[in-house]
Regions:
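A structural motif
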Residues: 36, 111-120
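Active-site beta-loop-alpha junctions of metal-dependent nucleic acid enzymes
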Residues: 46-70, 74
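RNase H-like polynucleotidyl transferase catalytic core
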Residues: 74-79, 93-111, 127-132
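Acidic/histidine-rich, metal-coordinating catalytic segments
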Residues: 52, 70-85, 104, 157-162
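C-terminal domain-tail junction helix/linker
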Residues: 1-8, 12-14, 85, 94, ...
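Mobile-element integrase/transposase regions
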Residues: 1-37, 56-59, 70, 177-181
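Residues immediately flanking
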Residues: 20, 39, 51, 79, ...
Length: 181
């Protein structure tokens, strides 16, 4: 289902864009990097998997729900096969609306595409994965924490996503947020 034109995006969690990125740190090693970006607060959740299937996308959805300090109401994805079957079912079970973009329209998922660029430039440019998925995800989790809690964002008037939420949407911060990392 495409996002209705009148669907209002006003607070964190109204729409979270989700996408994958192919990583080839060196010959013979391949990872799928999943990124979720909240379009209002720029809060990111990132995780790497060995491949991108609907089972991994479902697992990533669980990571997203666990690591956001606000309820996720809707996710927006491209039409990739990883966002079908088990992922669609998981969205329905969690009560999360699923919006699927038309084919070949990455500009409509621009926030998460920009997030990929930031993670490539600021994380992967300085951290070289060794081929160990567990180690990569441990380091990605540390980077995610820095990104959401320490790194200022120009788009948020130099606030961090956490500061932005606390300042503009204080009622959304859930009690689980202190246990996220």
């Amino acid at each position: 289902i495409r996002k209705p034109k009148d669907y209002a995006v006003q607070e964190p969690g109204d729409i979270v864009q989700v996408d994958t990125l192919d990583l080839h740190p060196f010959p013979g090693v391949h990872f799928k990097h999943f990124t979720a970006r909240d379009v209002v607060s720029r809060w990111d959740v990132i995780e790497a998997f060995s491949k991108a299937s609907s089972r991994q996308a479902k697992a990533f959805l669980s990571c997203l729900i666990e690591r956001t300090p606000f309820p996720v109401k809707a996710v927006q994805v491209d039409g990739g096969s990883e966002f079908m079957a088990e992922f669609e079912q998981a969205c329905a079970e969690y009560g999360i609306r699923l919006f699927v973009l038309p084919p070949r329209s990455p500009k409509l998922n621009g926030r998460v595409e920009r997030a990929h660029r930031t993670h490539l430039d600021e994380f992967y440019a300085v951290f070289a994965p060794e081929g160990d998925l567990e180690s990569l995800n441990k380091n990605l989790r540390s980077w995610e924490w820095v990104y959401n809690n320490i790194r200022p964002h120009r788009a948020l008037d130099n606030l961090t996503p956490k500061q932005y939420i606390e300042h503009y949407h204080p009622g959304l911060i859930s009690s689980q947020s202190s246990h996220m990392y």
